[in-house]
Amino acid sequence: ELGSSDDQTTWVDLYKRIAVINSTLEEIDRLDLKTDQEKADYYRVKGESLFLRGQFYLILANLYGKPYNPRTASSDLGVPLKITSGVEHDKDKDTQFERATLDKIYSQIESDLLASLEAFSHSSKHVLYRASEKASRLLLGRVYLHMQEWENAKNILEPLFGNIALSSLVAGDTLSEDNRFLNEDNTELIFSQNSQFSQVCWTGNAPEFCVSRELYNLYDENDRRKGCFKKNVDTDSLALLYKYNTGNYQARVSDVLMLRAAEAYLNMAEACAMLGTDDATANKYLNELLRNRIVDYQDQTYTGEE
């Protein structure tokens, strides 16, 4: 994790968060709900908690386990799966927790996100820094892509379109140091779990936030991402200067655990392409995204193999 030299920081931090979520989910079911507002708050907190637990286990599974493979998921080990608030202790065991298989972990992630969608159907308010129905739907679509369940991915993502908007880079104000892509007014942003680090850690100038000259040169000259996100300098790498705010102040919008509309379009295109029977729909979503990124873009037709 950035900002720490301790290799266990991410592991410890995420399990601490999961422990709080487990307690929250158990306690809110003991509440005596009387008013409509109390019921709405209950569903909002439940939906947010389930979304976050699913998100955190997805991160843990990908950081510390193998990539999901449907053929081996029932035997591939991931991380310990803890979904209760109690403290277990068995004096006869050398270790209190064992690694769960990937199929069990992903099944729990799927269950949490589906349950969060149900909760959000009773409390639909959307705030950038809070989980929402749109955030849960997009994250679950990503999970289904990991699981190679293309039809499920397509079906869960489809209701998003019409309720999300792409940010156009081919019209309007040019991005600059005073007008960054990642900001609270960008309608493309669906969810941002803002950074806990001061913004100085996320300036986009550090070496780990640079892209190679080779990658930079792959962008077409009409692709606005080439100039909007990157500053061209006389080195072998380029800083993502116009994507992040710079300066030493508390972070707000951050791409750490961010969800935005562009991913929905890419994920939908991937799901349709991988189905092998819906190339037309895959092209539709990919072309719509690129029309908002490349000046004078002409729609392309690709096959699933491409």
Task: Label each region the model flagged.
Residues E1-S5, E88-T95, L238-V253:
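Short glycine/proline-rich turn/loop motifs
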Residues E1-G65, A100, L113, L117-S123, ...:
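Conserved, well-structured interaction surfaces
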Residues F120-K154:
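Aromatic- and glycine-enriched pocket-lining scaffold segments that form the walls
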Residues A40, L63-S107:
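Short coil/linker segments at helix-helix boundaries
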Residues Y106, W150, D278-D279:
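TPR-repeat structural position
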Residues R130, N152-A262, V295-Q300, G304-E306:
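Hydrophobic-face positions in mid-chain alpha helices that act as interaction patches
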